[in-house]
């Protein structure tokens, strides 16, 4: 998908071997004139199983973090000497995280996906991207 206008792929560090369990990317809504959810729907119509959105809330919104709940009674990590108990996180601390969680396009990925499958998926994504680039804001 490198070089496909409007497709923003995950960053990959040189020399790092990835073990994908999901494949994700975002789109430039200005290029396609549609939302990520609409792009995901168009992919699904092509038989490409992408959804839009990851988890509903950032990790710091969950009770395990907010209420410092732990498994058992250890209190770890909040009882460790280096813990900083006064730290609290809010949506204002992570606006990019909030945006990303609702805009990322995601497909489950596993060891059963072959190189041929990956090429077929890329071909379908390119097809949808090309259509919306030529017909921005249109409904597929």
Give, region by region, the residue ranges found by the protein language model.
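PLP-dependent aminotransferase class I/II
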Residues: 1-140
């Amino acid at each position: 998908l490198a070089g496909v206008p409007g497709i923003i792929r995950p960053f990959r560090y040189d020399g790092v071997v990835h073990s994908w369990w999901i494949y994700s990317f975002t789109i430039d809504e200005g290029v396609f004139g549609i939302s990520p959810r609409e792009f995901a729907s168009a992919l699904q119509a092509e038989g490409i199983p992408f959804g839009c959105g990851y988890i509903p809330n950032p990790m710091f919104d969950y009770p395990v973090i907010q209420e410092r709940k732990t498994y058992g009674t250890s209190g770890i990590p909040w009882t460790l000497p280096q813990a900083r108990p006064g730290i609290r996180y809010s949506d204002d601390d992570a606006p990019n995280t909030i945006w990303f969680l609702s805009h990322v396009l995601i497909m489950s990925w596993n060891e059963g996906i072959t190189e041929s499958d990956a090429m077929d998926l890329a071909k379908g994504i390119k097809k949808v991207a090309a259509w919306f680039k030529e017909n921005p804001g249109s409904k597929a």
